[in-house]
Amino acid sequence: MYSNFQSKVVFIAVALSVVFTATKIKAEQYPKGPITMVVPWKPGGGTDRTARLFAPYLSKALGVPVKVINMGGGGGWVAWSKMAKWDPKKDDHTIGWVNFPHMLSYLNPKMKNKNNLDSFNFLTGHSIDPCTWLVREGDKRFQTLPEFIAYVKAHPNKITISVGGFGSDDHQAVAFAEKFIPGFKVKKIFGNNDAKKLQELYGKTADAVGGNISYFVPHMLEGKLRPLAVLGKQRSNQLPTVPTFEEASGVKNYNFAARVLVAAPGLPDEKGKVLTAAIQKAMDTPEYGIRELRGHNTLWKVDGTKLKDFLTALAATVGKVKFWDLPK
């Protein structure tokens, strides 16, 4: 009887060993083929540039080719709607980029978008680019943020700020100021890329621009632009002498463009860990880091609970501002 029991124990142990080994081998074989990386914008934008620069390094880390495809439209939602429905089996070799705070436009009830943060499988953050407000160097009306705010209050709806699209990080930064700084009312020019913003500023169609640090640093070095503030929790390493919005005004106006990589919802944890580890390994490649530094793009390696908590807090802030209800 003892012998039979002992035989069963041995059999179970062997069976479990076989299952464990098979699972391990299967995990080690992932990915089995090329990875598709989806950019939710048309070719030529910042995320597209980053994706194409990053792809060869991720390919090396994974040991398989990485193909970048563009799926623009709907302010990112043509692609994001598909990402939220990716099948963990059929789409296990597909990853995509999600941009914040742009993706949080789902909070706008007018969009009737049923997706939310829980609709996505976030792997890891990749890069973060704080916003900044800039004016023309030498503008006698204002050269500091307190001067700018005071002038706006004294001249409501007379100052024009050029920003990106409606609901973009640039727009939300201005909307936050309108919501929480009494008397701060400005006109806005929407839908401009950064080059167009500068044309409007230099041509005096706009009095100020809202954008991301990475694009404007080279123009600041030319001595044509005066940064009023950085809209981050800390000062930027690229602009160490420029105060944060909070330092200069006492208002906690934090806004930025952040890029996060996602995989199919429900993807097995072991596969998600392989992808996350490879992405972060590629980000740590010295050559890649230098190339992003030259482009003034700040890498942002955060995952798991910290990433989810960060995004949840951001969604709460956007929900309080309700930029969609403010005057355009």
Regions found by a protein language model. Give the residues of each.
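C-terminal lobe and pocket-closing loops
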Residues: 128, 215-284, 313-316, 328
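Hydrophobic core
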Residues: 14-20
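Surface-exposed, polar/charged faces of alpha-helical domains
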Residues: 154, 270, 277, 294, ...
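N-terminal (or domain-start) structured segment
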Residues: 27-119, 158, 166, 179-210, ...
